[in-house]
Amino acid sequence: SRIPQVYGVADSSTISPEEASDYYCQRKAYIEEATVLSYGPAAAETALKLDDGTTEPFQYEFGFGTGSDAASSLPVCLFAVAVVCSVICAPVFASDYSSGADDIQRCALYGRKRLGGTRVLAALTLSAALYAACAAAFVAITLAVFGPDGTSAQLALDALVLGNLTMNGVLLLALVAGLLSVLAMTAFTLWLSAHMRRPVAVLAVSLAVAMSPTFLMVLLRGMPLGDWLRLLLPSGGLGLGTGMIVDIQAGKFLTLGPVAVWTPFAALAIPLLEAPLFSLLALYSYTRHEGR
């Protein structure tokens, strides 16, 4: 139960009926106190605004969020898909550089921008299709065994969950964030491949970036810098022990002066920007390489 957490006690049996009846007001105070302590007044104000639309009382329903470990196994699956996509995309440009095939291709009528654009689009489409297949299989198996879950995320995950979210909504957000992060990692790998001559080197750098969020959360645990660095990476939503579900659960913020951004919003917005950015950079780098 998340009730003892809100009241700051170890056992719910120590909470009187009068105190328990005031749970929702107590939870608001807990959110404000915890957020001010960790991120300052601006973040606390943002947190309370986000929580204004929360449906009360909270609902409990048995399903995948309360009866399985889907919340911990889904990030592992998403990370595995990202690694596979990186392996597939690493040689897209670099293999032709190393073999010399690029010298022939650049002399063809459509061997410059059109060929590069086609390769980028094909790689992104393949990654999206692979992700969709894996995500569909995961969701189908999970829902078939445990069923959907309308439990309020505040009960299933943490009292610091903000907004009107059920576990069904959390799963949907995690899948969307995973897709955006996989596409961002694919585009980043293509950019590396357009820059480097050896596919092995491209893959090594790509895998290092993919694993960086996990290491950052271990080395910089509890430090705002760790969240900044993690979420700015194209793999920010794919680390083991990190990701959208953890961000929703932890009630974290990115703060810059008076501005505070809830980390789940950043986990959606940043890869949405990085995927087209790195795709364009990959195409630009490939075109420049052809002109040398």
What residue spans do the PLM features occupy?
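Secretory targeting signals
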Residues: 16-96, 117-196, 236-265
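Cytoplasmic juxtamembrane regions at transmembrane-helix boundaries
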Residues: 99, 107, 191-210, 288-292
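Short helix-to-coil transition segments within interhelical loops
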Residues: 106-112
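Residue-level recognition of pore/gate-forming positions within transmembrane alpha-helices
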Residues: 122-123, 207-211, 275
